[in-house]
Each structure stands twice: as structure tokens, then as C-alpha cells.
Amino acid sequence: MGNISRHLEQGNESVANYSDILRYASGLCMVEESVQRMSIDFKGAHFPKNVILYAVFFYVRYPVSYRDLQEILAERGIEVDHVTLNRWVVRYSPQIATQAQMRKRHTAGSWRVDETYLKVRGKWVYLYRAVDRDGQTLDFMLSERQNVGAARRFFKKAITSSGVPHKIVIDKSGANLAGAQAVNNILKITGADKLIEILQVKYLNNILEQNHRFIKRITKHMLGFKAFHSAAATIAGIEVAHMIRKNQFANDNCSPFKVFAELTA
């Protein structure tokens, strides 16, 4: 850690962007971890917790619009307007996604990293995603830009949640290559025994391309996102639903909704 501090004082930009990578990977961040494991607070909600969670889960798991969901809930005797449904998804999905990252099963150290595209306010934004060699979700990040800075932020986020990989497979993107190389620069500076093997082989990322399809299938029916923060929150919920579908949690013998609900406990 002394090496990192020294380079930070010298203003090394790549180190400044990644100075906490090894802190998280080596388990030196127990305070943050304990905070993240706290249960989600539903105080002040005007509906029962299970009703809120059912609505959020249904929206992020199935291809429906908010008005569709409003009608579905009304048929079950629950009167709630589409604006409230949107508020629930935006408020609770990111919190549930944080819990999901803390509780997901161990993932493999061989990563596949790529990005796909979504529209927010009529403009394209970029969804960075990483899965392991078995297709298990590692992490994700919505970005308004597709550049080296975004790639660096994503690698930092993914390593924070899933540890340092031994291999990263990317496409021919120069930005993603620079992001992965920045991680190796940090490992060199901090005296790591091994660096990450970086491969640019498109066909090895086919498993991630197939993974993208689930996300696109759900978002296709959402009639577009009006704001970046609501898009990011909704994507977080969709990713959790996809992780449940892929049995990434220890209680995967339970129903998908129960697994989702238990992430809030």
C-alpha cells in the first residue's frame, strides 16, 4: 500500500484511478462490506414490502411496460399507478443489485468483457458487462461514453466486486485494451506475482453476446428510458433477475421471486 500512496503523491493518473483495486481484492475493506450487507429499509412505504418487491421483480424479469404491470397488479387486487411503480424500481433495484454482488456465488477468474447499446432520451449509451467463462455475471455499468475512461471505471468496478482475474478476453476495442492494461500497470507497481493475461479474440466473447440478448429482450418492451439515472437503476434490477435465472445464489432451490426478495433481508 505504501507504493500506491507514493505514486498517488506523484500524481500518476492511472494509479489514482485504480488505487483502491487491491484494497478491495485483498479484503482490506471490511467496513464498506459490512455496510453493504445491511438490510434494505422499506420504512415509509405505503404498500407492504412483498407487494413492492413483487412489482419490482416482475418488471425487471419480464418484458412488460409500467402500464402493463399496473394492469397485471390491478387484476390481483393491487391498485398502484405506473408512476409509483417506476419510483419503486428506481429506488430499490440498485440496492438489491448491491446485495446481489455481495452474495453471488464464487465466479471463475477467466473473464469476458464487452459492451452493448441502449437508448436514453433518444441517444445511445453504453452498457459495459463482464461474465466469466461459464457465463456467470461478474459486473455491469451503464456509461454515457465509450472511451478509455469508461473502460477503466468499469474494470475498477468489476475487480472491486469480483476480485482480480487471471485472464480477460475483450474484442478489438482499443479503449477496453487500454483499460485492461491499466490494471496490469497497477499490478506491476504493487509488486504482484502475476499479471492478467489479456486476449483480443472476438469468438471467445460469443457467450457474452448471447448474454446480452436477455437484457435486450426485457428493455425492448420498456418504451425507452427518459433519464440516465432511471436507466442505470432499471438495468441493475434486470441484471439481478438474470443472475437469479443463471442460479448464481446459494438458495437457488427457491422460487426466483423468493431469491430476489431474500436479497433485501
What label would you give each PLM region?
Residues 144:
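Short, small-residue-enriched loops and turns at beta-alpha junctions
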Residues 1-119, 148, 152-168, 172-265:
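Charged, often Cys/His-bearing segments associated with DNA-binding zinc-finger transcription factors
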